[in-house]
Amino acid sequence: GQPIAQSKAAMRRALRSMQPGDTFQVIRFSENASALGPDPVPATPDNIRRALKYADSLEGSGGTQMIEGVRAALAFPHDPGRLRFVVFLTDGYIGNEDQILGAVHQHVGPARIFPFGLRSSPTRHLMDRMAILGRGVVGYLGLNDSATDVMDGFFERVSHPALTDVRIELLGVESPAGATVGVDVFPRVSRDLFVGRPVIITGRTDAG
């Protein structure tokens, strides 16, 4: 149907947006998870063609067990020479939110997570929290949205981050009486700053 067609269109656009020197992997998840191969592969023309064929062969089946996809996507060893972007595409209602968020929190490491929900069915709270924990950005595609246009915009943003590993720390804040006060900042570890996507930081002091 329309959701799987949108998913395939988004995957095709993402694969064709790979740059020389990139590596990638494609993971399918429903009741279980399966992958294009055991490890990320270089973005060579042959590997991209193989991945496009794999993506075209995918069909929707069963329920949406996102936990299997999360575990599979975050299980690859970290490459200190690369910044890993994990893009999740789903159109299903997703249960076991606490288990999924716990797995993301435990295994995300330095990876960035970008969840994309198709139609109105995905659980927005879960998608939003995954993006926060993964220091990424959440996106939603309606039935009339172009998956190609959405993925083009996504790659345009993430290909040119203005700042990465943004951390906020305030020291020596004084109250009107001159006393040093404590400060709470949220989030302490922010997502990366991308062009056209402002980062919002909030703070609260003991002084109110």
Where do the protein language model's features map onto the residues?
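Exposed acidic/Ser/Thr-rich ligand/metal-binding surfaces
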Residues: 1-208
